[in-house]
Amino acid sequence: MTAIKGKLQELGAYVDEELPDYIMVMVANKKSQKQMTDDLSLFLGSNTTRFTTWLQGVLDKLRSVTPESNSMKTSDAIIFESSMPSLKSLSNSRDDLAKDVPTLTVSSTRHGRYDSSTSSHVQATGSSGSVARLTSAVKPLREFSPSEAVIDIKLDLDDPFNEDLSLATEIANLSRKRTALSASYRTLRPTAEVYRPPGIGQHAYHTNENNSSLHRFPQSSFVSGRSLKLQSSMTVGSSRIQDVSDLSETYKTAFRLASEKSLREEETSRKRRLPVASSVVKVKKLITDEEEVEEEGEEDEEGTDCIFRTAGISSSVSVPAKPERRPSLPPTKQANKNLILKAISEAQDCISKTTNYSTAAPQKQTVPVIPRSRLLPEEEQLMLLQNRSSLLNYPSHLQELQHQAMPEPLHKLDLLSRLQPNLEEEIELPNPVNSEEAEILRPLDSRSFILKRPKLSKEPSPQIQNNSVSPPCPAQPLPGRMIQPREAPTYEKPASPKFIVTLDGVPSPPGYISDQEVDESMCYTEQGETCVEQLGVVARPEQNYPMQLVTEPLCTNDVVMENTSSGTKEKIRERCKYWPACKNADSCAYHHPTSPCKSFPNCRFADKCFFIHPNCKYDAKCKKADCPFTHASKRFPVPPVKPVSTTSSSHPSSQPCRYFPACKKTDCSFYHPKHCRFNTQCTRPDCKFYHPAVSVPARHTLKWTRAQASD
């Protein structure tokens, strides 16, 4: 076998173990040189004749040196010995053979779907020319017991049934080769060790480097008991088979069984290629004894005939526990557990904390105005008594009021805080007593105000005197007007609480307002405090309106000014004619451009455009009336332009020009006849166009030149 492999490598035709095995099968079947040449021409090509000649010479030499003394063997027969040494004595037997004679050993084993049915190892004979013999040995993993029979198969050359037997064997081998073709290239790669629970059959493939041979024992290399018994019954010994028909039936049965076996092996190999979900696979590197563990799912009958299976129930399935999920990121990129725990603890602390907000902070609340709501009876009576007492005890001297002006805000604040039980509740308006007054005092708007809670004084308020309540405003100005004092206050404005009063007289909670907050219904005094404006109705004692202190009585010589809602006067929609030299700047009532004009120079508004045009380089000296550029300086009056007569331009004179066709005046007002396009080639006798006496040259012959500018 080694010699054949070496020769194939020399010829460059060695690919795998299939071809040497096929050649050994042909040698065993006693193929002639011509038959070998025909069969191997597909694989070897032009080297077929050279190889078959060499192989035939080797076989002839082996036949010639076969010893004649053996009576059980003929000189031209190939000897098939079935010797079964153990794995332990394998190296010793090889050493013994090497000591005796250099022999050419052919070892045949079955490989199932990985190789062909026969795996041979050929040891080349030495140059000494000593005797060599061809043997076929089946080497299992264990020794047979003495009770088991050893079958020696010897074929006679004169047997007429050798050709039929060779044909059946070749067909069976070829069918096994087809099924094993897909897996024949997986013998030399790293193997995968599949973990299974105990009880599942395992098979190992061992490589013995000392013997330079590979022994494979997959489960597919063993057939069922019926096949073994049937093939064992077809032994060809020294006794001839007499009945030809029985032998033919036996060959047909063997062929059919071989075909069925090949189909089973195909199905088994297909199932083995499917992924196994319950197996943990660990890839191992190649070692000296190559081991390949496969999951076998054969029938129970085949499992009982397998001599290499371990003890246990082959049909039991054990699924290993689900492995713990491991993170896909490397340890360096994984989150630190301490950081995660720290973040969780901080989050819990943040959630557990309660924020204490200061009660003194100003709070905003929206107070809807409810014009037709009623106060409680007790509050109604209290406010009525306060208003009556304030009217009866009005102070007569202005000096006393001025001395009491400074401490007054605190008293008013305490009074109003006591009059209003809860500032957080909505302010309610007392219902007027008479229906006529209700119709007169009906509010004109129902706006809501955003108010701020004032900081109440912590000191106990003194007893409120009668003069601490302000009287009603004696003057009732018209609605929509604002009364301003003639003189500015001589002292700094105190930080007193102020009140926002709506047009319908609804009292609002105290709050801080800025100087810019101006309401149309407010009447400002020196201290900036407000008093109620009523819509042309004289205040009566029975009406419940809160009054405030007025430090200076209103006089008739107060200036009454119109209240303007907008702070700035709207500009006139016309461009300032003095821009950009206008001295009023932003206070100018006219429009001053601020952005460049996008339609310049095609802007049709000229100097009236609301956008900036570039400056005119002539500025004040510009004489063009409709100049689109900007003129910063004042221009001199432009003399009126003499109007052009429209009759000459729109309706030219019917009198022909006497200089035609030599007239060079572009704006000539006389009649210039139109040239005929056909010129002198015109054939119409009644053509109304002009036909020059001298023919005008063609257009393509004329050359246009630029006229030289005259100095």
From Swiss-Prot:
Classification via Gene3D superfamilies: 4.10.1000.30, 4.10.1000.40
Which UniProt key words apply to this protein? Metal-binding, Nucleus, Repeat, RNA-binding, Zinc, Zinc-finger
Q: Mention any Pfam family matching this sequence.
A: zf-CCCH_2
- Composition bias type Polar residues, residue spans: 460-470
Q: Which GO terms describe its cellular component?
A: cytoplasm; nuclear speck; nucleus
Record SMART domains: ZnF_C3H1
Zinc finger (C3H1-type) boundaries: 570-595, 596-615, 616-631, 657-674, 676-694
Q: GO molecular function of the protein, one example?
A: pre-mRNA binding
Extract one GO BP annotation from the record: regulation of mRNA stability
Q: What is its main location?
A: nucleus
Stated role: RNA-binding protein involved in the biogenesis of circular RNAs (circRNAs), which are produced by back-splicing circularization of pre-mRNAs. Acts by binding to both exon-intron boundary and 3'-UTR of pre-mRNAs to promote circRNA biogenesis through dimerization and the association with the spliceosome. Also binds the poly(A) tail of mRNAs; controlling poly(A) length.
Q: Which family does it belong to?
A: Belongs to the ZC3H14 family.
Q: What is this protein called?
A: Zinc finger CCCH domain-containing protein 14
Q: Which organism is it from?
A: Xenopus laevis (African clawed frog)
Q: What is the lineage of its organism?
A: Eukaryota, Metazoa, Chordata, Craniata, Vertebrata
